[in-house]
Amino acid sequence: MNRKRPLMVLGTSSGAGKSLMTAALCRVLHRRGEQPLPFKGQNMSNNAWVDADGGEMAYSQAMQAWAAGLEPCCAMNPVLLKPRGDSTSEVIHGGTSVGLARAEHYYRDWFRPGWQAIREGLQTMQQRWPNGRLVLEGAGSPVEVNLQRRDLTNLRLAQYLRANCLLVADIERGGVFAQIVGTLALLRPVERPLIKGILINRFRGRRELFDEGRSWLEQHTGVPVLGVMPWLNDLFPPEDSLDLLERKPNRGPTDLEIAVLKLPSISNFSDLDPLEAEPSLRLRWVHPGDSLGSPDAVLLPGSKQTLRDLETLRSSGLDRQLTAYATNGGSLLAICGGMQLLGQELHDPEQLEGGDGAGPWPGLGLLPLTTEFGGTKALRQREVQALWPGTTPISGFELHHGSTWASDDLQPICNEPGLGWWCATPAGGCIAGTYLHGLLDNGPWRRRWLNQLRERKGLAPLITGLPHHGEHRHQLLERLADAFEQHVDLTPLLQP
């Protein structure tokens, strides 16, 4: 067995760019004829993917799998924590939900099971791809001194696998020298030799402007600076919902404006990536307390805590704005938890969704739907035939608790019952909801929906013969890898 030295991407902080740099590294190694194996022992994210076997994993590891030329599998992210609010997270081990954990008890109750899940994930990866090279991503900072003893996914894993580590620092946020020197100073003596290089990320301007800083870092740390990556923040959307606050809307000339509700428990906002890539429209994030305005459509993404987000809609007055918008002929598209919010009634007998009690809870009443949370979580990929806004094959995945029932007045979105419904409104608008994550990845479906909006404004239709958004993602990964190969010297990192 030709077992290659694992590589690991660590960061001086959260948001340093570890996920993208890991994806870039995977694509570069794949180009060179290797089989990179992306792996993040523990991730905390509500942006999830469902693999072909119905296992749940972080979307960032799915993206890294595509970069590596692989189909995503949940072994690549054996521990996933999905925040629910109030310092509580759903715990996913090996793609399956195994319970809830409070922050203050997590390391006491879940450290040993988590480490076991990580070891099992590694075993699965190495058995499936015995000649591959593990490319690991760390989490947050590797030197949080109050957490180091129970670290699951940074230096414990690097030592366990004897990985060569690359330390990534984000210069855009300032303080990059203190970040790097401080991180290296807090490493234990046995950990310091694992760091083979430093990568400066998100540098603006000419690279030679950093030459003096590069020399200083190498002189004061003894660790080579392997590269200075340029600002590529617009290439991929952010992994974490907090980073959405930094997103700036497209301010160029556009034909359509779509308002997206940014509620506290937003999840699976990767559903919006295909719209971000559409040059003819502008996405505008609407936070609680903002004015909804008069967009061409409103999109309600998924929610990890539907009832909590419902309360936010009501307390902020966004519920009244949405109702007025729909009554006056507005168009709405809601995905998963967003669709549940639009319904007439929600029941939560197991109190899974952040409400105070079992309900029933009145929804926004914009679609005649009834939802009951509970039971086994629906986790599966789907390939179905769309019936609205046109007949076309579509694919995606389900990821939700409970079931939803519709009145006979609604029309199905596709030929599989229970996946979504739509209706025209008396004022000429349209309201639609679906459980199918990834719906907008389907190019022909997305363009048909956009063309409905364009027709209402008297605009010419867009071509509908587009490939799946995965093709666009592939092109972005190629551009990312091009930049990585141009600006980063991997030689020290790839030493045996």
Curated annotation (Swiss-Prot):
Keyword annotations from UniProtKB, A to Z: Cobalamin biosynthesis, Glutamine amidotransferase
Name the record gives this protein: Cobyric acid synthase
Active site residues of this protein: C336, H437
Keyword Cell inner membrane: no
Similarity section: Belongs to the CobB/CobQ family. CobQ subfamily.
Organism of provenance: Parasynechococcus marenigrum (strain WH8102)
Protein purpose: Catalyzes amidations at positions B, D, E, and G on adenosylcobyrinic A,C-diamide. NH(2) groups are provided by glutamine, and one molecule of ATP is hydrogenolyzed for each amidation.
Pfam families: CbiA, GATase_3
NCBIfam families the UniProt entry points to: cobQ (TIGR00313), PRK00784.1 (NF001989)
Pathway: Cofactor biosynthesis; adenosylcobalamin biosynthesis
Record-level GO BP terms: cobalamin biosynthetic process
GO MF annotation, one: catalytic activity
Domain GATase cobBQ-type: 255-445
Family matches, as InterPro entries: Class_I_gatase-like (IPR029062), CobQ/CobB/MinD/ParA_Nub-bd_dom (IPR002586), CobQ_GATase1 (IPR033949), CobQ_synth (IPR004459), GATase_3 (IPR011698), P-loop_NTPase (IPR027417)
